[in-house]
């Protein structure tokens, strides 16, 4: 089948993306088994345009209405049968479910693949929400707001959200540019940018997902040991300054335990992870709703979370109960626990007290003043700290005095140095996860609709949550509490939990389970991503990771993922792992934007995204923003990430990635000279890269001027899709004598190309025979990969009026040459009526009459024409023909679905052509055609000797006038006759070589000729189709039509021309199209 009927339902496989799309047609008629069958159980004639002897066999062609296209139907399918087979195949390989749909217990029978059924909400929107919301929202956003201030925090959120939104726009364009099978984001990037970039970015994406698992696990451990079960800690600080080391060691031990457990869960079965995904998502949503509920409640009833201040310094509340220096117990003033910490004595002695403690008062302020308290103004500005700085509240009185070093653990201090760039790197992971929807592309009912809508809505939703959360935190929570990363000043409560309603535990438990769920999702997705890369076999040493369990589970890839995640666990700091994660995701997003920009600027014919709201400038802005964020957040991490990607790229290039995925980078090769030509030499272009590379065959008049300049106009309008254009012509004669003439003709053509704005090359050859010259052009034009795949040939006007067969012989021979060379052929008829480049069609239709599948040329050409300003306003209509046994209603539905996947906007109409009796007009028209052929033959062969001699003289004088650049020499018998100089010898020669029994004795007997039945059927096809086409498309700006193939034997050449004339009668502008034997359009991205 052609490439768009892709994966049979009964045996889906993953990883064979490069095998999904065929490059050439197969014989749909199964001719090897049944030579006289059309593949539908009906008999047909073995050759079109049969001789009378063959017609006398009485073989009746199965479909009278399509008799003219009999030869095409030998090797190409009818539209009805093509669409029928299309709907019986699934257009998607299965996604994550394919591993569960493994072989049954017997090991020989696979479960039937279910049709993808997930919609936008469940398939894209909610998974994106779950992956975007994560540990940073609950553990670091409040700290970021307090440190950067509300204004700079909003700026950080804006930059990061703009980056992901621009990336989502580019991703939506790529995702809707055809069907994206399972493989999701990696598939899109690799098939758009090629194996080198695809492998490098794919591995960066894999490493990012793997480190995300480590980050989520570290977040879960932080919540567990800090807020849920602090006594569970294994390591305790040995001294006042050893808290950091003890915390890191606890994170490493518990992180390793959690990672091992999660890896075992994923190994046992991904279905358990998917079943709990909804629960984890519910935890996230409930937690966020509780934050908003708490913010609203704080307006009239703020929660009680007092913060103890010494002067303007924040004290760590988990070490004492009473926020005062002294307390009255039984009418006696005694020292509090706080006094003993600062004075190292339980008594009220001041000898060894901390000077700052003695000079400043201890006060208590509300940690959550509420939205009505006006703290927003205080929290607008930044308060960046260095490592070890004490968190202070501006505005509180404070006596300047030295503080003892031993007292430092009693304060809330900054554990890391902060700046705007550091916060960007830490926050960015909280906006990643936008590709969760595209990763499930194999499970979506309509990925081209769901991915853009769901992803962009999820980004807008999460962005609004982040923006509102920044403002809410700044308006409700005291600044010193916001800057308190671990909640030490509010009795080791999660800061965001202090605001939540009805209880802080809602946030604590919800965030814990959501981070655990996100970690499981990352450990599930990363091995499958590595498996997809390994199965593509672009990085040889990763090949082992493409294997797994019997049911397809990537066991070895899971093991490697766990080992890499363990490296992140050993770092043991959420704030250190987050920037690493940011680098890899930013690298991935950068190349998504690059892929979209490259495809848009190259304007490849296959670049037809259904998502229209993209622009190359937006993609470049997104790419620049990603690059800037990489270096802003951590320039050394950025260099390391780029170095890793560069090394992978060069390794794949060094290994020689012999993959052809139709990547956009190959389009750049057309402008890269020798290196590019050598690359293009490697093989035929992928279907996605196919564009009409034109060879325009021009006819020159006696003064070497272009006879039909509108052929060049048409070529320039068609090449709005860019690509290669070669303009060729033939000068008849000797090369030595006509070299100067050829140079003059070439210059004339170049001038005309410049006038018509045709960017390409010109080649004029000198040949003794025009037919041979054209054949040489068709065979040898171009260099390496820059070769033509389509020929534009002018129509032989006036062939009916000419008695000389050279008027149309060369045309048919050229058609045969293009067919033999497997080139597409475009024949614009009535070229003088085609629009110039200065005209504009403000309305109208381009009508496509799709009768026989030709590889998609008929679909692609109108799309390319509509890229030009002349045709841009025209709408596309596609007509196809239904026969008696076709379900026209179903055909229309199938055709609409097919066009939807091709990303083509067109009206669809199925025209029913029922079998009808051959009309008297058809019979008469056929009779006239055959009588004319016989008459012309007789006029050439049955003259008297005197008439022959006069005719010979006349021929010699008229030959120069009748001869054209596209006409060939006379038949062999005529050539042989001309070589004999003596009149008597020539006549004798003709008399001896012609048997009068082969033709009627005189013209009167012509009326008794009975027309050949095969010609009657073909004439019937031409007449009926012409009637239908003229009725439906008489007002169309352009009509595109399948061009029937020429007869296999030359006896029917003249009749073939008549059939084409009848087929196109009454139409102002017609483009006859004949495919080149390969697919040129695809539903895949």
Swiss-Prot record:
InterPro entries: AA-permease/SLC12A_dom (IPR004841), KCC1 (IPR000622), KCL_cotranspt (IPR000076), SLC12_C (IPR018491), SLC12A_fam (IPR004842)
PTM annotation: Phosphorylated, phosphorylation may regulate transporter activity.
Any one Gene Ontology BP term: chemical synaptic transmission
Disulfide linkage: 308-323, 343-353
Full protein name: Solute carrier family 12 member 4
Keywords from the UniProt entry: Cell membrane, Chloride, Disulfide bond, Glycoprotein, Ion transport, Membrane, Phosphoprotein, Potassium, Potassium transport, Symport, Transmembrane, Transmembrane helix, Transport
Lineage: Eukaryota, Metazoa, Chordata, Craniata, Vertebrata
Resulting phenotype, residue 223 to A: Decrease in Cl(-) efflux and reduced sensitivity to KCC inhibitor VU0463271
Positions in the Cytoplasmic compartment: 1-119, 173-196, 441-450, 532-554, 599-612, 652-1085
Catalytic activities: K(+)(in) + chloride(in) = K(+)(out) + chloride(out)
Keyword check for Cell membrane: yes
Activity regulation: Inhibited by WNK3.
Single GO molecular function: protein serine/threonine kinase binding
Subunit composition and interactions: Homodimer; adopts a domain-swap conformation at the scissor helices connecting the transmembrane domain and C-terminal domain. Heterodimer with other K-Cl cotransporters.
Organism per entry: Homo sapiens
């Amino acid at each position: 089948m052609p490439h768009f009927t892709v994966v049979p339902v009964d045996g889906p496989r993953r990883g064979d993306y490069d095998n999904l799309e065929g490059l050439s047609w197969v014989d749909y008629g199964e001719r090897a088994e049944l030579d006289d069958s059309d593949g539908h159980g009906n008999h047909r004639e073995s050759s079109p345009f049969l001789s009378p002897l063959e017609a006398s066999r009485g073989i009746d062609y199965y479909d009278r209405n399509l008799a003219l296209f009999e030869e095409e139907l030998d090797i190409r399918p009818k539209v009805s049968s093509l669409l029928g087979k299309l709907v019986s195949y699934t257009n998607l390989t299965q996604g994550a479910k394919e591993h569960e749909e493994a072989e049954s217990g017997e090991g020989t029978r696979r479960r039937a693949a279910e049709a993808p059924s997930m919609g936008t909400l469940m398939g894209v929107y909610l998974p994106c929400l779950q992956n975007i919301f994560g540990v940073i929202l609950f553990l670091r956003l409040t700290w970021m707001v307090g440190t950067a201030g509300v204004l700079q925090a909003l700026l950080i959120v804006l930059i990061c959200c703009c980056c992901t939104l621009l990336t989502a726009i580019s991703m939506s364009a790529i995702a809707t540019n055809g069907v994206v099978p399972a493989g999701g984001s990696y598939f899109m990037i690799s098939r758009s940018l090629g194996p080198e970039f695809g492998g490098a970015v794919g591995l960066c994406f894999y490493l990012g997902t793997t480190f995300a698992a480590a980050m989520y696990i570290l977040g879960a451990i932080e919540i567990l040991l800090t807020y849920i079960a602090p006594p569970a800690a294994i390591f305790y600080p040995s001294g006042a300054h050893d808290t950091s080391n003890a915390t890191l060691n606890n994170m490493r031990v518990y992180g390793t335990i959690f990672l091992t457990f999660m890896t075992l869960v994923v190994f046992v079965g991904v279905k358990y992870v998917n079943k709990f995904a909804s629960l984890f998502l519910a935890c996230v949503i409930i937690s966020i709703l509780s934050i908003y509920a708490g913010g609203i409640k704080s307006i009239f009833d703020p929660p009680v979370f007092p913060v103890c201040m010494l002067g303007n310094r924040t004290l760590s509340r988990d070490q004492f109960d009473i926020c005062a220096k002294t307390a009255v117990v039984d009418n006696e003033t005694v020292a509090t626990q706080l006094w003993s910490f600062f004075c190292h004595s339980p008594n009220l002695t001041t000898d060894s007290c901390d000077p700052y403690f003695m000079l400043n008062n201890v006060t208590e302020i509300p940690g959550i003043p509420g939205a009505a308290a006006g703290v927003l103004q205080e929290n607008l500005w930044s308060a960046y700290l260095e490592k070890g700085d004490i968190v202070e509240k501006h505005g509180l009185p404070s006596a300047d005095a030295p503080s003892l070093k031993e007292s430092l653990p009693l304060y809330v201090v900054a554990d890391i140095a902060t700046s705007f760039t550091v916060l960007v790197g830490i926050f960015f992971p909280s906006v990643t996860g936008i590709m969760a929807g595209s990763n499930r592309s194999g499970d979506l009912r309509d990925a081209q609709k769901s991915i853009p809508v769901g992803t962009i809505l999820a980004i807008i939703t999460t962005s609004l949550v982040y923006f509102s959360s920044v403002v809410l935190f700044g308006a409700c929570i005291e600044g010193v509490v916001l800057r308190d990363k671990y909640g030490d000043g509010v009795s080791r409560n999660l800061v965001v939990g202090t605001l939540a309603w009805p209880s802080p535990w809602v946030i604590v438990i919800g965030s814990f389970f959501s981070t655990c769920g996100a970690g499981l999702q990352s450990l599930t997705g990363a091995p499958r991503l590595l498996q997809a890369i390994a199965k593509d076999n672009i990085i040889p040493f990763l090949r082992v990771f493409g294997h797994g369990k019997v049911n397809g589970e990537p066991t070895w890839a899971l093991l490697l993922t766990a080992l890499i995640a363990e490296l992140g666990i050993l770092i043991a700091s959420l704030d250190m792992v987050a920037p690493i994660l940011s680098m890899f995701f930013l690298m991935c997003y950068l190349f998504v934007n690059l892929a979209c920009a490259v495809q848009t600027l190259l304007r490849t014919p296959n670049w037809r995204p259904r998502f229209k709201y993209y622009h190359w400038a937006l993609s470049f802005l997104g790419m620049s923003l990603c690059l800037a964020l990489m270096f802003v957040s951590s320039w050394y991490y950025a260099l390391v990430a780029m170095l890793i990607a560069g090394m992978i790229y060069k390794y794949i290039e060094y290994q020689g990635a012999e993959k052809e995925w139709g990547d956009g980078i190959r389009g750049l090769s057309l402008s890269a000279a020798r290196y590019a030509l050598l690359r293009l030499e490697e093989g035929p272009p992928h279907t996605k890269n196919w564009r009409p590379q034109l060879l325009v065959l021009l006819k020159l008049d006696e003064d070497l001027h272009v006879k039909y300049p509108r052929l060049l106009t048409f070529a320039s309008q068609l090449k709005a899709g860019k690509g290669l254009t070669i303009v060729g012509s033939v000068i008849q004669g000797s090369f030595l004598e006509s070299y100067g003439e050829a140079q003059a003709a070439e210059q004339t053509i170049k001038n005309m190309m410049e006038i018509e704005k045709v960017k390409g090359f010109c080649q004029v050859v000198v040949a003794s025979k025009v037919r041979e010259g054209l054949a040489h052009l068709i065979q040898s034009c171009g260099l390496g990969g820059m070769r033509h795949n389509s020929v534009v040939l002018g129509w032989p006007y006036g062939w009916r009026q000419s008695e000389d067969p050279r008027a149309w012989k060369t045309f048919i021979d050229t058609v045969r040459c293009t067919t033999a060379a497997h080139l597409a052929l475009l024949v614009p008829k009535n070229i003088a009526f085609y629009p110039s480049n200065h005209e504009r069609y403000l309305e109208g239709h381009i009508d496509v009459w799709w009768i026989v599948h030709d590889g998609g040329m008929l679909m692609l050409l109108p799309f390319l024409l509509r890229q030009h300003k002349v045709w841009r306003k025209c709408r596309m209509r596609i007509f196809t023909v239904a026969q008696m046994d076709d379900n026209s209603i179903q055909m229309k539905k199938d055709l609409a679905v097919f066009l939807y996947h091709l990303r083509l906007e067109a009206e669809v109409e199925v025209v029913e052509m029922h079998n009808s009796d051959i009309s008297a007009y058809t019979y008469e028209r056929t009779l006239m055609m055959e009588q004319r052929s016989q008459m012309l033959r007789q006029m050439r062969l049955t003259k008297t000797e005197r008439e022959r001699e006069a005719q010979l003289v006349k021929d010699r004088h008229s030959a120069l006038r009748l001869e054209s650049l596209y006409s060939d020499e006379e038949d062999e018998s005529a050539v042989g006759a001309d070589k004999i100089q003596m009149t008597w010898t020539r006549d004798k020669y003709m008399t001896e070589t012609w048997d009068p029994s082969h033709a009627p004795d005189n013209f009167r007997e012509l009326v008794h000729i009975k027309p050949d039945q095969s010609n009657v059927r073909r004439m019937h096809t031409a007449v009926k189709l012409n009637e239908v086409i003229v009725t439906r498309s008489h007002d169309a700006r352009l009509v595109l039509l399948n061009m029937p193939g020429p007869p296999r034997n030359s006896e029917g050449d003249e009749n073939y021309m008549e059939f084409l004339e009848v087929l196109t009668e009454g139409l102002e502008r017609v483009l006859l199209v004949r495919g080149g034997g390969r697919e040129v359009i695809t539903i895949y991205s």
